[in-house]
């Protein structure tokens, strides 16, 4: 094998490598939708891809108004009751007692029992 054949082999290998890199870059530009193709190869491409994927996902927004979550979210007891309802399907305050303080004591006891049982 003479030096011309070696040089030709190296040249073909470099051209093949460049083609493979170009093909992979072209596929990467298509991953984030049509609106990001124009930004391919720039700094804004990552931002465009991030926004595109966030739009497509079913993630909840990073911020949600309190009225959308539930009322009384500042009260830890309300939060505990909400968690208990989610896990058991029924309310913690099931007593027919008319005294609000008695209802609160019962619900606090049940909330603490719930936390104690699920403290694994």
From Swiss-Prot:
Post-translational modification: Contains 3 disulfide bonds.
Family: Belongs to the scoloptoxin-20 family.
Species name: Cormocephalus westwoodi
Gene Ontology CC terms: extracellular region
Region described as Disordered: 87-106
Compartments where found: Secreted
Keywords: Disulfide bond, Secreted, Signal, Toxin
This protein's name: U-scoloptoxin(20)-Cw1a
Any one GO molecular-function label of the UniProt entry: toxin activity
Composition skew (Basic and acidic residues), residue ranges: 97-106
Phylogenetic classification of the source organism: Eukaryota, Metazoa, Ecdysozoa, Arthropoda, Myriapoda
């Amino acid at each position: 094998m003479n030096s011309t054949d070696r040089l030709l082999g190296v040249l073909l290998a470099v051209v093949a490598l460049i083609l493979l890199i170009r093909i992979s870059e072209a596929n990467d530009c298509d991953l984030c939708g049509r609106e990001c193709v124009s930004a391919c190869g720039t700094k804004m491409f990552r931002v465009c891809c991030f926004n595109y994927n966030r739009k497509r996902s079913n993630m909840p927004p990073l911020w949600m108004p309190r009225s959308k979550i539930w009322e009384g979210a500042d009260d830890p007891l309300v939060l505990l009751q909400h968690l208990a309802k989610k896990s058991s399907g029924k309310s913690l305050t099931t007593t027919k007692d008319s005294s609000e303080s008695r209802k609160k004591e019962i619900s606090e006891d049940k909330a603490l029992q719930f936390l104690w049982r699920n403290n694994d």
